[in-house]
Amino acid sequence: MQHHHSVDASGVFSGPVGADLRAKLASDENVLAALQVDLSADLRFVSGWVVVTSRRLLARAPGATVSRDWALAPGLALKLQHHGGVGTLELHNPQERVAFWRFTLGHHPQALRLVQRFEQQVERGA
């Protein structure tokens, strides 16, 4: 089984975390954008990741031992904001916020790219 990734996500895919993420991808699932998140919900420096694929959004919150995923579907939205040097990426369904991740602003360009690719895939009806 071979995986073809559409972006250079080498930072996200290195080490044991990368092996775990690669194991979660279907053989025909492409990574379109990746974001390293480096702040926990209580603003401690801990690593995590958020990835948009051709089918879904996958994430491992900083400090978490398991990842979560959401199928890309109409009604899902990613909202990006920053305040005081901290970026926040929020995932919303039509009713509520279902997840959020925090990161230092050095990762803001990755976050912008991730939101853009997410929106493109949702519009296409992934």
What are the functions of these language-model segments?
Residues 2-13, 20-23, 40-47, 60-126:
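Acidic, Ser/Thr- and proline-rich intrinsically disordered linker/docking segments
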Residues 26-44:
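The phosphoinositide-binding surface of pleckstrin homology
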